[in-house]
Amino acid sequence: MKDTIRQLIQQALTRLVTEGVLPEGLTPAIQVENARDKTHGDFASNIAMMLAKPAGMKPRDLAEKLIAALPADEQVSKVEIAGPGFLNFFQNTAALASRLDAALSDPQLSVRKAGAAQRVVVDLSAPNLAKEMHVGHLRSTIIGDGVANVLEFLGDTVIRQNHVGDWGTQFGMLLAYLQEKPATSDELSDLENFYRAAKQRFDESEEFAERARGLVVKLQAGDAECLTLWTRFKDISLSHCQQTYERLNVKLTPADVMGESAYNDDLANVVNDLKAAGLLVESNGAQCVFLEEFRTADDTPLPVIVQKAGGGYLYATTDLAAIRYRSKVLKADRALYFVDQRQALHFQQVFEVARRAGFVHEGMQLEHMGFGTMNGADGRPFKTRDGGTVKLIDLLDEAQERAYTLVKEKNPQVAEAELRSIAKAVGISAVKYADLSKHRASDYSFNFDQMLSFEGNTAPYLLYAYTRVAGVFRKLGTPFDASKGHIVLEAPQEQELAARLAQFNETLNNVAEKGTPHVLCAYLYDLAGLFSSFYENCPILGAENPDQQQSRLRLAALTGRTLKQGLDLLGLETLERM
């Protein structure tokens, strides 16, 4: 609808230029927003205030001329002037109802991408291997997955890339410890304890640390024995990761893994190509790129180091190799990096180096989708009581157990197997939604009691809202036929629900553009609240006549499908009953 209004305004502007009311050459960005007060319209534009000065007119006078120049459109019932010169558009309820009827009959719910489909690389999760995933990996994994799902639903070709840390000092440390204490497969499967023991030896013994560093060199040189053991550790670690992904209901698979080691053979080429492009400068024996726009606090150039004095490579080198691969081989139009906000400077520098070196094709977008920190109740990074790192799998276990206790209290008569199934959906969804519903750039405090509440903007509330819709159709007694009848919007609650349903397409396009799943969460929460008001004020099964009942059933059906689709895109499992 906003696009329609923008087009109408553009046609009016063109007409006013032709009539000499407006000067030629104006190219304003036409802004159309949802009106806050629906009694004053559904949409508002400040275009008259934007162009009043170049037109040499008062904003309200220009607004009157714009209204007179607007072409008629069946989707707009009237346009009014408000305040200093806002244009308020009222949408035609019959046209709105017709759009919702079309959405109900469309598997895509009338959702279409605003623009051409693209090939999009989504870089997400990226845990360091050799130990189990911890809570610090949650945000990248689920935010990236949610955005990837939305992009796919809109028609983009999405290439998930799990850039795992599968190379480096930690593997030398593990190999050295394995030489000292040969372990069985069962012992190795307990990666956390094995890693902890190896790390303790590394910290306490310089001789052990030296041997570990030597094994890293052998590994990088392609030593067969080291590579065999490294592969064993990597496979065990990836198996742990995959179990966690499945628990989280994210779509990452082993085929999406493209770790640091995948780019090893190209790192020397990256350095050579940077040198050939005239970008490299030697500084204290290291190979660096200096970009004028990046400087330290004392105004000295800030280097991007791509090769250490000893010949070793750094994260920047690997990231540059990955960028080139994603551009030249994967042919990506866009690459989204869901990585901690604290890496913002790193990515700004690496992206600029990649562009100057010609590693990305013209028009390719490189975007760092940074996120804040998950904190504990004390406002500090989330830790165990003894100050250790919280394993992600332990967090999910506790969420499920807490959800089980909660659900059992409310439904003591439900069979044990069903209770466990409900608890799994509620517990995992609660953890994910508590994160996804916050702006990704914000820090937030983890609180089990808040996230498991059935009130407020939480997963349990939304899951229950969906079961409430499903309950309407269970009580109907006969299969609902979506091909019959039409939506008619009479009551205010019907109109408000319908207007929000019509914004699903816009909402998903916003998520795709900005990488912000919290926008979808806010939409679904809003929708659930509007359905509740509709349900309480507009009898569905007790409607006044069959036509009204079918209209309201159609509204309920579209609400249910929209809620389910939205929750599914966020990676949340819906339930038919709770």
UniProtKB/Swiss-Prot annotation:
The keyword ATP-binding applies. It is found in: Cytoplasm. Keywords: Aminoacyl-tRNA synthetase, ATP-binding, Cytoplasm, Ligase, Nucleotide-binding, Protein biosynthesis. It comes from the Bacteria. GO terms for molecular function: arginine-tRNA ligase activity; ATP binding. HAMAP family: Arg_tRNA_synth. This is Arginine--tRNA ligase. It comes from Pseudomonas syringae pv. tomato (strain ATCC BAA-871 / DC3000). The lineage of its organism: Bacteria, Pseudomonadati, Pseudomonadota, Gammaproteobacteria, Pseudomonadales. The gene is argS.
